[in-house]
From Swiss-Prot:
<dbReference type="InterPro" id="IPR020584">
    <property type="entry name" value="DNA_recomb/repair_RecA_CS"/>
</dbReference>
<protein>
    <recommendedName>
        <fullName>Protein RecA</fullName>
    </recommendedName>
</protein>
<dbReference type="InterPro" id="IPR003593">
    <property type="entry name" value="AAA+_ATPase"/>
</dbReference>
<dbReference type="GO" id="GO:0006310">
    <property type="term" value="P:DNA recombination"/>
</dbReference>
<keyword id="KW-0067">ATP-binding</keyword>
<dbReference type="Pfam" id="PF21096">
    <property type="entry name" value="RecA_C"/>
</dbReference>
<dbReference type="InterPro" id="IPR020588">
    <property type="entry name" value="RecA_ATP-bd"/>
</dbReference>
<dbReference type="GO" id="GO:0009432">
    <property type="term" value="P:SOS response"/>
</dbReference>
<keyword id="KW-0742">SOS response</keyword>
<dbReference type="GO" id="GO:0003684">
    <property type="term" value="F:damaged DNA binding"/>
</dbReference>
<dbReference type="InterPro" id="IPR020587">
    <property type="entry name" value="RecA_monomer-monomer_interface"/>
</dbReference>
<dbReference type="Pfam" id="PF00154">
    <property type="entry name" value="RecA"/>
</dbReference>
<dbReference type="GO" id="GO:0140664">
    <property type="term" value="F:ATP-dependent DNA damage sensor activity"/>
</dbReference>
<keyword id="KW-0227">DNA damage</keyword>
<dbReference type="GO" id="GO:0003697">
    <property type="term" value="F:single-stranded DNA binding"/>
</dbReference>
<comment type="similarity">
    <text>Belongs to the RecA family.</text>
</comment>
<keyword id="KW-0238">DNA-binding</keyword>
Length: 354
């Protein structure tokens, strides 16, 4: 850049700082790059699939999926992990369906959790904005976008048409709160539902409610699906769950994680650690037996997971080894939550157990 351009730029920057304050414009090279702070989801595989060890603070996150797929369970798990770090969390329950007893079983400190059950969509989003601007809240969950009913729709007749009203409400609210979320370094999670588009011949007919604004403003979008049942004998005790990162502005997208959600207990973290430790060579598996550092820890996955539950220091050390390896830049974690690599061993385990 020649001297005249440098002088013109310096004058422009000086005028901008005088008018808008110091830091209104800055060179990116003048400051060291800082890692994006993240809050764990409670699932090791999902934390790794997200690329930064969890959901990013100061950003908007959308979690969507079919009914009973684990959306609320996942967000309550995030709240539980945040509270363990001393964070203050809020739950905007637009669906009026939050079960404190279930939240407590997942590890949420319900006594410290702030809960709001607003009457209208405008009220819910206004409360969310005020909580963000307080700079005192670390995590806010809005459950759900589909339940953010505009005031005009509530006050109108049942058959009245309100085309695009909810989409306009979401668009206006997100324009207003996005900057505040960044300044407050607050994680805001919107839970969303799936609807079907009529007349779609090619591509997926699925779409989410509330218009397109949230798709653009969200830094991370997670598609959560129930893929099967977890059984003990004939009794169904949980769900096999797959989460796909369909959008990620802070790491490479389209990774996915698979884990189990046990009814009344939440994400089966110890079982996930066993699977990932075998997949990446930290735990050896011979037939039905699992060994860690030369010592047998259990016969079968369930017994090995119980060993980790009874020995939290070993569990934490194993989890740290997995995180250190897979969260290193340049490591491919596309199949981090998949179990294809140990399917053959699982067959051998089933044969040994039977």
């Amino acid at each position: 850049m020649d001297d005249n351009k440098k002088k013109a730029l310096a004058a422009a920057l000086g005028q901008i700082e005088r008018q808008f304050g110091k830091g209104a414009v800055m060179r990116m090279g003048d400051h060291d790059r800082q890692a994006i702070p993240a809050i764990s989801t409670g699932s090791l595989g999902l934390d790794i699939a997200l690329g930064i060890g969890g959901l990013p603070k100061g950003r908007i996150v959308e979690i969507y999926g079919p009914e009973s797929s684990g959306k609320t369970t996942l967000t309550l798990s995030v709240i539980a992990q945040a509270q363990k770090m001393g964070a203050t969390c809020a739950f905007v329950d637009a669906e009026h369906a939050l079960d404190p007893e279930y939240a407590g079983k997942l590890g949420v400190n319900v006594d410290d959790l702030l809960v709001s059950q607003p009457d209208t969509g405008e009220q819910a989003l206004e409360i969310t904005d005020m909580l963000v601007r307080s700079n005192a809240i670390d995590v806010i969950v809005v459950d759900s976008v589909a339940a953010l009913v505009p005031k005009a729709e509530i006050e109108g007749e049942m058959g009245d048409m309100h085309v695009g009203l909810q989409a306009r409400l979401m668009s206006q609210a997100l324009r207003k709160i996005t900057g505040n979320i960044k300044n407050a370094n607050c994680l805001v999670i919107f839970i969303n539902q799936i609807r079907m588009k009529i007349g779609v011949m090619f591509g997926s007919p699925e779409t989410t409610t509330g218009g397109n604004a949230l798709k653009f403003y969200a830094s991370v979008r997670l598609d959560i699906r129930r893929t099967g049942a977890v059984k003990e004998g004939d009794e169904v005790v949980g769900s096999e769950t797959r989460v796909k990162v369909v959008k990620n502005k802070v790491a490479p997208p389209f990774r996915q994680a698979e884990f189990q959600i046990l009814y009344g207990k939440g994400i089966y973290l110890n079982g996930e650690i066993v699977d990932l430790a075998v997949l990446h060579g930290f735990v050896e598996k011979s037939g039905a037996w699992y060994s860690y550092q030369g010592s047998k820890i259990g016969q079968g996955k369930a017994n090995s997971a119980k060993f980790l539950a009874d020995n939290p220091e070993i569990c934490k050390a194993l989890e740290k080894q997995i995180r250190d390896k897979l969260l290193t830049p340049g490591v491919d974690t596309k199949a981090v939550g998949s179990r294809e690599a140990v399917v053959a061993d699982d067959v051998a385990e089933a044969d040994a157990d039977s």
